[in-house]
Amino acid sequence: ASDVYKRQIFSNKSGAGGSIGIGFAVPSNMVKTVVDSVEKGKVIRPWLGATGQTIDSDLAREFGLKRPAGVIINEVYPESSAVDAGLKPGDIVLSIDNKSVEDRDVLRYRIATLALGKTFSMEVIRNGKPAILRFKTKAPLTKPQPNTLEVTGRNPFNGAVLANLSPAFALDNGLDDMKRGVVIVRSRRGSVAERLGLKKGDIVLTINSKKISEVKNFKDIVLSLIHISE
């Protein structure tokens, strides 16, 4: 769809391919971001590397805000744009690139429609005082490498597929991009892992009180347990 000046405003989109009088549209700035990244061979949207909670009426009163709007940051991911900007837990994000941030969904949208590799402003409230942060947009981190492993043998993880979790891998597989560690990507139908309730998105933290930090570490511990049981 275009405005009166014939500038592209929306791009029509329907997942079903049919039409019953309902219109679908994607904002043109998101289309431009996607088109630019497709020209480089893959759709890559900017990733902030921070998560938080929408400011509701109760939080607005608690922090002395005029109205319930914004996102209070709970966590930032190492080496992310959020860290580069100096964003900290407790900061309240009010706008990105001079565009208001009403809630968590709007924050994600604002970031997703920015151009990669460019510098933008972020308006925050920190300790009750306004501040302007600047950050350069980045693609989701690809470290660590997934090193995907399908588990076999006599152990409770038989039939599970595991991988090292990175923000890029998480987003590609519909997982939480703020989590770290070894993640269950899927469990084969009818497998031991599925029967035990292991499912996509589960994070393996420890096995027999031994911390699991990566796929190699997981594999070594599981193999040692199999050896002990034999």
Describe each PLM feature range.
Residues 1-5, 227-230:
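Short, small-residue-biased leader/transition segments that mark boundaries at the very start
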Residues 14-19, 60:
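A short acidic, helix-capping loop that chelates divalent metal ions and anchors anionic groups
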Residues 33-230:
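C-terminal recognition in membrane/secretory proteostasis and scaffolding
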Residues 2-16, 25, 29-37, 95:
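Active-site-proximal beta-strands of protease catalytic cores
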Residues 21-25, 100:
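Hydrophobic alpha-helical scaffolding
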